[in-house]
């Protein structure tokens, strides 16, 4: 069983329906049983908006969606819409594109997002690492985790490429989880990334989640990378499906 907890609609297809078909066929080809597709925070996007992603995957029992949102884009209205969708059980997470947009993860403007996440028991995902890395630097993520103890925070990309700094700073925050998407993107960095993961996964095996960033990164390469890690097989099972199922409340 593999859950890829970090996917986007792929580029290179003419419309949303063909993107969906490609994504589903790639999941099958790569042996991925369950996927979480993350929408953009934009109202129109090549990776799909909140509306697009709910509509597209409502008939796919093995594909769940997480909703992108931004304090800069129609915030109040999008929050209302998000609440409506969460009430209907349409999203399993909420994503903040810290760094891609000038959003600081510990900014007070994000309070309504954390409140919704707590109310509907879904995690808040945030981009971290390359691309204005200061927006979700580990110290800021730590502050956000402490300010929102009732929320689960998912740190996407683990502050890539500074993974060790991320784990060291955030290991004391029990409500922060680590999404491994895109960490195997650069084959040259894979050996050093593997070394860091082989050290930290056994320290907190319940807090790592497999993801590939499908749509931006190679899913097959990420699966091969994670399966080759030198960690106990129980921990590998946690990382490739058990933890995601629990953290996102999805059955596997
Ligand atoms: Zn992504």
Residue ranges and their predicted role:
Residues 1-5, 17-34, 118, 204-207, ...:
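Mid-to-C-terminal alpha-helical segments outside catalytic/metal-binding sites
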Residues 2-5, 36-39, 66-68, 95, ...:
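Active-site neighborhood of phospho(di)ester-bond hydrolases with catalytic His/Asp-centered motifs
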Residues 2-10, 125-129:
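Histidine-centered catalytic micro-motifs
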Residues 8, 22-44, 62-70, 92-93, ...:
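Divalent metal-dependent hydrolysis catalytic cores, especially in the metallo-beta-lactamase
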Residues 10-13, 42-45, 72-74, 101, ...:
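Active-site environment of divalent metal-dependent phosphoester hydrolases
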Residues 18-23, 47-55, 78-81, 138-140, ...:
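Alpha-helical scaffolding within the catalytic cores
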Residues 34, 48-125, 130-131, 174-176, ...:
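Active-site gating/metal-coordination segments in enzymes
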Residues 92-93, 107-209:
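Catalytic pocket-lining loop regions of alpha/beta-barrel enzymes
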